[in-house]
Design a protein with these regions (language model features):
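Structured C-terminal cap/extension of enzyme domains
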Residues: 46, 230-361
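Residues that line or immediately flank small-molecule/substrate-binding pockets and catalytic motifs
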Residues: 8, 33, 67, 135-136, ...
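General structural feature for long, well-ordered alpha-helical segments within catalytic domains
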Residues: 44-47, 51, 79, 83, ...
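Active-site beta->alpha loop and helix N-cap motifs at the rims of alpha/beta catalytic domains
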Residues: 22-171, 314
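Bacterial Sec-dependent signal peptides at the C-terminal "C-region" and cleavage site
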Residues: 8-23
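Sec-dependent signal peptide recognition
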Residues: 2-7
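Catalytic alpha/beta core domains of metabolic enzymes, predominantly
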Residues: 152-160, 167-288
Length: 361
């Protein structure tokens, strides 16, 4: 009997069934962690871990780091690896149902593979079953560049990878046909897509990508979730990827209601509350960090509202920067008046009252 059990166990591991179970959990809000800094501009890894734990406390399905531009471009290789290691250590010591996702983004294939190999090494040493995320190569120019980049990643990755479709205006977004082809040829690695095209273009692309089911498992909404409700109800997206950790309570409620389907009771109201929270226009509006940093401070997760900001700007919106300019940063602080803080506080308090009435923790 012991031999039979051992044979079945080896067979299950060998067929990748553990990864398949993991893959079934890759949906819902996968929130990108904002990078916290000390007063001297160095990365505050302790607060990074606290931020991830806050999301996990609200049953956020997944968290991702490093994935936003500033966390990729303005951090050194050593800083990115140190943050990844800190998060893996937290998941090792305090296992969570929230799926940890490590970004292995690279300027080119060589750099991406370095991060992917380091991530796999961390997985082997820690035993933590995290997944990966990767945007296209920063200096990619053609769809062939993108194809070769993701094919190379598939030779290293032993776990699911979420493909983010956008990096900058100089690198094209991978076509739906390419994304479907990758999902079909590498079913244990690809099939999870963060569709980050701008505005209405995203809707057309999401529909095309979902034509690739069942190889395509999940298409995530993006861009802060402005169209998340429409894209879920009318198109069939199954999650959101955005830098919105401070709003984990309301995103978890929205997802709870989305999963109910026709039995949902407050989905429209919950989504309206979420939209209110992320679209306050009486302050300087930054869709990624901005006043979300204030909420993280208010929650005791962050110590300040400091950010690394690009010193050099591209010649045109969302263009690429030369390698020597891409990593240059200055330390800036988001500032709010007492009146602005008072209104933000009132909004967050109202959000939490709504969440506490409707969310089943």
């Amino acid at each position: 009997m012991k031999r039979i059990f051992l044979f079945l166990f080896v067979a299950l591991v060998g067929c990748g069934c553990t990864e398949q179970v993991q893959g079934e959990r890759i949906e819902g809000p996968f929130l990108i962690l904002s990078t916290p800094y000390y007063e001297d501009g160095s990365v505050n890894y302790e607060n990074l871990v606290k931020e991830a734990c806050f999301a996990a406390q609200w049953n956020t399905p997944g968290v991702i780091w490093p994935q936003s531009n500033d966390a990729i471009d303005l951090l050194t290789v050593e800083e990115r690896l140190a943050g990844m290691a800190a998060l893996v250590e937290e998941w090792k010591n305090n296992p969570k149902s929230t799926v940890l996702t490590l970004g292995v983004n690279g300027d080119d294939t060589e750099e991406m593979l370095m991060f992917a190999r380091e991530a796999e090494r961390m997985a082997d040493e820690s035993g933590v079953d995290f997944i990966l995320a990767a945007r296209p190569p920063y200096y990619g120019k053609t769809e062939q560049d993108i194809k070769e980049y993701y094919e190379a990643l598939a030779t290293v990755a032993k776990r699911p990878v979420i493909i983010q479709t956008y990096v900058n205006e100089d690198c094209p977004a991978p076509s739906a046909a390419l994304l479907i082809d990758l999902a079909q040829r590498y079913p244990d690695v690809y099939g999870w897509i963060k569709e980050e095209s701008n505005k209405l273009e995203a809707n057309d692309r999401q529909q095309a990508e979902l034509e690739g089911k069942p190889a395509v498992k999940t298409v995530f909404s993006a861009w802060g979730g402005w169209q998340w409700l429409y894209q879920r109800r009318q198109i069939g997206t199954a999650g959101l990827i955005s830098e919105k950790i401070a709003y984990a309570p309301i995103t978890s409620l929205v997802w709870q209601e989305m999963k109910k389907g026709e039995n949902e009771t407050c989905l429209t109201e919950a989504f309206a509350m979420y939209r209110l929270m992320i679209d306050q226009r009486f302050v300087i509006h930054d869709s990624l960090r901005g006043y979300g940093l204030y909420y993280l401070m208010r929650l005791g997760v962050f110590d300040n509202m400091l950010s690394r900001s690009y010193t050099v700007q591209p010649d045109y919106p969302n263009g690429s920067l030369a390698q020597e300019d891409k990593c240059k940063w200055t330390l800036t602080e988001f500032e709010l008046s007492d009146m602005q803080k008072a209104e933000l506080n009132k909004c967050y308090d109202d959000m939490m009252k709504f969440v506490n009435r409707h969310y089943k923790r």
